[in-house]
């Protein structure tokens, strides 16, 4: 698991409850689900919002967890 990754919200669809975060280090975009946002005490994410997060791999896919606003 990669930790303390810095990135910006690429987009977030509050109707579908998911979106993607661009990593500042140039890595692949990371999926973010509403559950990770709620676990961080947030209601939603805004495009280009700066965040810090960890990446968890599940079944070959990267998920943002432990989300924090920068």
From Swiss-Prot:
It comes from Rickettsia typhi (strain ATCC VR-144 / Wilmington). The keyword Transcription regulation applies. Residues 7-67 form the CSD domain. One of its GO terms (cellular component) is cytosol. The gene is cspA. It holds the Pfam family CSD. It is found in: Cytoplasm. Keywords: Activator, Cytoplasm, DNA-binding, Transcription, Transcription regulation. One of its GO terms (molecular function) is DNA binding. Its main location: cytoplasm. InterPro entries: Cold_shock_CspA (IPR012156), Cold_shock_domain (IPR050181), CSD (IPR011129), CSD_CS (IPR019844), CSP_DNA-bd (IPR002059), NA-bd_OB-fold (IPR012340). This is Cold shock-like protein CspA.
